[in-house]
Amino acid sequence: MKFLRVGNIGSEKPAILDNHIIRDLSSVIKDIDHTSIGDNLINTVKKLDISKLPQLDSNLRIGACVSNPTKFLGIGLNFLDHALEQNLEPPKEPIIFSKATTCVSGPNDDVIIPKNSNKTDWEVEIAFVIGKKGKNISLAEAENYIFGYCLVCDFSEREWQKNRSGQWIKGKSADTFGPIGPYIVTKDEIKDLYNLNMSLDVNGKRMQTGNTSKMIIK
C-alpha cells in the first residue's frame, strides 16, 4: 500500500495510491498521522474495495506523507560511501540527531534558504515510519514496530551544523528543511530493504547515487 496526503497546505486529504490513481481516504481516516498509522489502518483498508473510493485530481499538491510527526530523528554518517568520501572513520555507534518537526514539508514544495545561510546542503535518505509506541524494544522485535518507509531529503546548513559549537539541530531544522514523501510504502511491499537504489538530482543534474546496502547501522 502507498499512503499519501494531497491538497493545499493545512487542508490536505488522506489518500491511497491505486495503481496511478489517487483515491480519497477521508471517509476512513481524518488524516495520516500518529493516531491513524498502524496495523488497524492496514487491516481496515484491506477490507475495502479501494476502486470505489472517490478519485482525486492528480494535479493536486502532494503534501508531507505524515501529518505532524511526533518525532523526527536521523542517523548521521550512516552510509559507508558517504563517510569515506569525507575521509571520516565509519562510526561504531549510531550518531543520532533530531530535526524539529516544524521543518517537515511536501516533497515538491519550495525549500526556503535561511537568511545568512552560506552552506545549505542536501542528502537523500530513507525514513522508517514507526507504527506504534514502544520502549526497550529488542532487535528481534524491532521490525514489528515499523509501519512503512518513505523518502526524505535531509537539508542542512553545514556552517551552522559543523562550524559552530552546539547540537546539529540548529543546522537541520530551518522551515522546509524536511521534505518527506511523496508517500509511505508499507513494509510488506519492500522485498529487500537493504538493496534499494537512491538518487538525488539538483536542477536536473544527478548529484547523489547510492544503495541501502551501504548502510552502516541497520
Q: Predicted regions span which residues?
A:
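N-terminal non-catalytic cap/leader segment that marks the start of a structured domain
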Residues: 1-94, 188-191, 206
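Catalytic-pocket segment enriched in acidic/His residues
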Residues: 5, 9-10, 46, 52-57, ...
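Short beta-strand segments
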Residues: 7, 74-75, 98, 123-131, ...
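Short aromatic-centered micro-motifs
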Residues: 15-16, 128, 200
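Short loop segments at secondary-structure junctions
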Residues: 20-21, 131-135, 155-156, 187-189, ...
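A generic local secondary-structure boundary/capping motif
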Residues: 62-64, 84-87, 111-120, 126, ...
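Structural signature of FAD isoalloxazine-binding scaffolds in flavoprotein oxidoreductases
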Residues: 89-107, 120-122
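RNA pseudouridine synthases
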Residues: 130, 136-152
